[in-house]
Amino acid sequence: MFHALASLDVVLVPLQLVLAMAGMGATMTLADFKSIVRDPSGLALGLVVQVVCVPLLAVGLAQALGLGKGWAVGLLLVAAVPGGAFSNLLTFFGRGNVPLSIAITTVSTLGCIATVPLVLRVAARSHLPPGFVLPTQRIVVEIFAYLLIPLAAGMVLRRFAPGRSAAVSRWSIRGALSLIALITLGALGSGKIRVVEFGWQPPLVIVVFGASLALGVPQLMRALGRYDDDTVATTIEVAVRNVGVALLLVHFFFPGQPEQAHVLYTALFYAGASPAFALPIMFRHGWGRSAVLFRRRRPRPG
């Protein structure tokens, strides 16, 4: 059964991404971005953190810890993908700047058609086999087909059938999460991922990566003078990543080699662990405390 389930990855992986992106699009309207247009600095900073700082952290960890090729590429792949719709929901619960969260998610998702191949080409080159050519065109086509088209379809639904969009979004995201659970079950049960054999280092590295984002980004945002609601939005956005995109691209790396399982394991483990990286700041700010550890509150005036 597990082997049959694992063999369905070629269908389940793109399907879960289509559902997730359609569900995210069904929550969005152009009005969500009006406040961001008036003050684009928060969006610009969030994108720099997402596209530049997060991959740099992954590169630093991979080099400092001497990660093997598959583990390094897996970590860099997770670092290259944008934030996901779940980050917007957690930002809402944490009383963060929801329009900013949605804006970073949307712009980074639209931009990932260029940024994901670029980050992988620049950062992962030294970890890939000699002669490996990154299939940039195929990556762009798959991102366009499985991310941008469903996202646009969801936004069109919200525009012309707002009464149905909430239910579509809710069930689409639930369906996407259920499919990720099935993908994980198939990978574990079929032996594609051997947790005991892989040992303790891979999950520890992933936890260090996620915890570094959760602890470091708030300090960076405070140092740059951002209010707490912006800090919550940006931190959750970079901590909770759209791992569905990473799962979509796993098959490009180390086909038929053991290292591909390392890439898959990294993506699936981060998908399961990432909410834990976002919960502390969500609860702290949601309960009226400072979004930044060991610092005073900095609420937005008015």
Where are these regions (language model features)?
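Alpha-helical transmembrane segments of multi-pass small-molecule/ion transporters
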Residues: M1-G302
